[in-house]
Amino acid sequence: VQPGKGYSITYDAPALAPRRPLVLRERSVCVTAWASGFRLGSTMEFSGFDASLNARRLAALERGAAEYLHVPAGPAARERWYGWRPMCVDDVPILGPVPQHDGLWLATGHGMMGMGMSAGTGQLLADLMTGRAPAIDPAPYSPARFARG
């Protein structure tokens, strides 16, 4: 698992602000709206645990939004932010018990899909931990796929 760095900019609401979430697919920009403002978010940067903000990445968010939104930036940027997403080398989450480490379970490596996969991940782990038959085959997600031997 390695960090994938995603960026966002949160703005105060302009007079003409988005009212619904938007995905600007051609520019890979997501817009999250609420009453007092909106957020532009996206990008994936593999830079280890570098804690700096990349101005080029932030500018790309604003350029992408400018192509689609009447007012692509609010009157004031409240926050310019990054967060690390757990990325798995094979782009498949790691879910299940860790071989040779009794009681240690993993649920990581979801990348940009963490929130969307959270309910399914929770259900799969709950089923495995309690001995219930899971609704899906857990083998593709097993930490054992990385075991040497």
Predicted regions mapped to residue ranges:
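Active-site substrate-recognition segment that forms the wall
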Residues: 1-102
